[in-house]
Amino acid sequence: MMTAAKRLGLYSALRACSATVFRSNLHPKVTVATMFCSVGTIPDVAEVSFSDSGAALFMSSSLWKVVAGFVPSRFWFSHTCLVFGSNTILFASLNSFKRSSSAIIKKVSLDTPVYVGLEKKNKMQPLLPCFFRRAV
């Protein structure tokens, strides 16, 4: 059974995702929607493995429950969000086929998209947003 708080978190993620798609001019909108708009829940456990992402894990002593927008894209890379939480400082990194790249590290408020990108020739290429909310 989904609580109201979970519904609100998913709704916020969907709204931010829609805004990303409508603002995007980098790719055809269908591609952007397919890459950006898959939303899943990450459970509050010490170690989580995503089967669709290769060997992507995230570990932390104090994990948050988060709502993360992620999809293993058939268009570009197979990737997912790796999330570490400490107060409101969230670290996101990208894991693609044979390359792992650090992405944006910044302070964010809850339900804020954090864009994960692949570094290419010293320029960050945005690939997907991650959406976060604290568990209630």
Swiss-Prot record:
Record key words, sorted: Membrane, Signal, Transmembrane, Transmembrane helix
Principal subcellular localisation of the protein: membrane
Bilayer topology annotation: Single-pass membrane protein
Origin: domain of life: Eukaryota
Transmembrane segments: 75-97
Residues annotated as signal peptide: 1-19
Gene Ontology CC: membrane
The keyword Transmembrane appears for this protein: yes
Subcellular location: Membrane
Note: Partially overlaps SPT15.
Protein name per UniProt: Putative uncharacterized membrane protein YER147C-A
